[in-house]
Amino acid sequence: MLRSFALVVGVTLAAGVAQAQAPQPPEIAARTYMLVDITANQILAAKDIDAPVEQASLTKLMTGYLVFDALRAKKIDLQQKLPVSVRAWKMPGSRMFIDPKMQVAVDDLIKGMIIQSGNDATMALAEGVGGTAENFVKLMNEQAKALGMTGTSYKNPEGLTEPGHLTTARDLSVLATRLMHDFPQYMHYYSTKQYSYPGTPPSNGNNRNSLLFRDPTVDGLKTGHTAAAGYCLVATAKREFPNVGTRRLLSIVLGTSSENARANESQKLLNWGYTAFDAVKLFDAGQAVATPAVWKGKENTVKMGRAEAIVIAVPAGSAGKVTTHISHQDPLVAPFTKGQAIGALKVSLGDESVRDVPLLALDGVEQAGVMGRAWDAMRLWIK
């Protein structure tokens, strides 16, 4: 059984927002697009986000994820030098301009893959981590499945056009979000504006993401282009707001007509998201949303909430129309561990449900002794 009670907050809501009340996004000239408020964990705008599309070099987001995972597991290190195979050297498309006579540090190869979008650097990393490109692709698909990217299939590590090498805007949002969350220590690569490996053409050094040069709040992530995919960009920005702090948005535009178009449409989406929606902090990180009674435990109550702040994206001017309902397991019987889901915060705008936030035990509660459990069992029976 769940016990619930209502709380009118005068602030809150977000966006999966009731369609009748959601702000209408600007006209976006892209095959498919998506705007996500990462801070509030809400979709603000979307078009055809489950349609299969060519990935182009957005593929390198997954390659990067696996390289960072290998670094975390200490299978490789940043200063380790990897060989450049003939296969890597002969990769077509964007290049870092490395060759088989070189041994290149992982740190430089990551820069070559992300900043220059080098297919040669990407192949060298894939072979270094996976042993072979084919084995690395297996790892890519296994990781996609683990992340819940149900519309994605990888055929290569760099993103060149190949039958069945497909993804969706929704899956890219999942990957980008997890990339930023799981590996914050490596996100500086995506905001670096220029890089050239010593002895290679300096004209090749500018980051393909032109928003980095236009908007100081943009700090990533990755461009892509092939004839089949069109011009694509997964971009992210963070801006500061009173009472909320840093608010991060993620835009995905796929299948635009030019480099300039992908930057313009991404900028349009980001600016619209920051102005059409307000961010409202409902609860601080670690703050008790409610303190329900505990049965058969060494403690009589437990605080439930979230380790991170609970923030909601609200259509501008709509905060006063929001209500929340808090529910929890009833009876709430020990034992349970810190971080275990024991309730939910339901947010509504008017009569329409907007978002459900799982509420976790902020502390664990051990089971009481025999006498304590027996006493509570009798009380529950009477109840």
Could you describe each region identified by the protein language model?
Residues 4, 20-22, 307:
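Positively charged, low-complexity intrinsically disordered regions
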Residues 16-22, 360:
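Bacterial Sec-dependent signal peptides at the C-terminal "C-region" and cleavage site
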Residues 20-184:
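Active-site-adjacent loops and short helices of periplasmic peptidoglycan-processing enzymes
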Residues 150-153, 161-166, 170-383:
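Domain-terminus/edge residues, biased toward the C-terminal soluble/receptor-binding domains
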